[in-house]
């Protein structure tokens, strides 16, 4: 059996062919406009036409995803996917069985299948990028919620909200790499597109005052979110993914800031699979669905 896997991101569509034991034998990536759903569908069709020997399709998609029906009620930045049944569309196009799951849940499933969560019953995955997302594994089960919105950690308040625009005070608006870059651009008067997270952290290492202030606020925001999550779900482990985790000292710096919150007994580590987590988690979900229907 070969499974075609798709991981729909904000700037890229990752594609792969994966074997049932988790070996990725082919990968491909296409740059996309995160809001262009039709382009994403077209890229999927091209990849499937190039790989006609696959016997199933697994999809990791953003937004609120009903994995049973395949309906995406809200597709995040991809407005084309609002109230769109991607599972039915792919099945009609190919005649193949299709399984679809939320992208953050796929990252968690990859950790459960082939990562550090294999023997765990209570853990969280947190992804830090242009936004903050996550997945919840509690009492031995993936938690999706009544409307498939569980794990939207970025919508937690990071500070007391204002009356007129409460969303301004969420983690998504205060504690992401995009926000960090915007803040640095404002304080230095430089164009946002010139600034990278790597540059800000390099300046932090060089004891640049602006970078030190912003990075300290960044870590404090993450710790605030982790504090809330730990007391909500009591996980034994939290695994963090996203580009920030490529920084060798990230976990050590995060734990240093966590000390002031009095949290020491939850194990916090980087996630295992980096950019392949979405593909692997989607395939694991596909295999679970196939076994359930047998």
Swiss-Prot record:
This is Beta-glucoside kinase. It comes from Listeria monocytogenes serovar 1/2a (strain ATCC BAA-679 / EGD-e). ATP binds at residues 5-11. The keyword Transferase applies. The keyword ATP-binding applies. Catalyzes the ATP-dependent phosphorylation of cellobiose to produce cellobiose-6'-P. May have a dual role of kinase and transcriptional regulator of the cellobiose-PTS operon. InterPro entries: ATPase_NBD (IPR043129), ROK (IPR000600). Signal peptide: none annotated.
